[in-house]
């Protein structure tokens, strides 16, 4: 099977949906294959381990929740204050509600991070990168 970026993205999106719908215990290669309507074994060809699945999910969540640069450029031109703060919050809520599966999957990862140090480490790295991008 030829690996390609588009299929990897489709599988990562399927993994996000599986995690959001079934929780951490339901996140398996087979469940991802089924959700993506891909032949059995496809997800394991792209993601050799659960850690690789988690990394792909975090990358995909990051891409899906990325702020619109035009909106943020507009907000950056406004004077600081309560209204600006409210606009930033509205933008965050809008992105989370438009990407419900990604938001729920992120909560699932936060729960799993309390039990699995590798997930906690990946989530911390992801959050720090997001913070640096915001600064």
Regions found by a protein language model. Name each.
Residues 1-6:
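N-terminal intrinsically disordered/low-complexity leader segments
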Residues 56, 69-102:
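Hydrophobic alpha-helical connector segments
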Residues 10, 14-56:
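Helix-turn-helix
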Residues 10, 14-22, 67-71, 105, ...:
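Solvent-exposed, amphipathic alpha-helical segments
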Residues 66, 97-107, 114-135:
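Amphipathic alpha-helical packing segments from all-alpha helical-bundle domains
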Residues 59-66:
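Short, basic, alpha-helical segments at the C-terminal edge of helix-turn-helix-like DNA-binding modules
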């Amino acid at each position: 099977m030829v690996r390609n970026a588009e299929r990897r993205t489709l599988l990562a999106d399927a993994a996000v949906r599986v995690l959001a719908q079934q929780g951490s215990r339901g996140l398996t290669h087979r469940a991802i294959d089924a959700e993506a309507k891909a032949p059995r074994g496809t997800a394991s060809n792209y993601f050799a381990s659960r850690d690789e699945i988690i990394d792909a999910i975090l990358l995909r969540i990051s891409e899906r929740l990325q702020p619109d640069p035009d909106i943020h450029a507009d907000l950056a031109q406004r004077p600081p204050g309560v209204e600006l703060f409210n606009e930033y919050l509205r933008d965050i809520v809008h992105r989370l509600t438009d990407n419900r599966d990604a938001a729920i999957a992120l909560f699932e990862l936060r729960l799993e991070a309390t039990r699995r140090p590798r997930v906690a480490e990946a989530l911390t790295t992801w959050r720090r990168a997001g913070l640096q991008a915001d600064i």
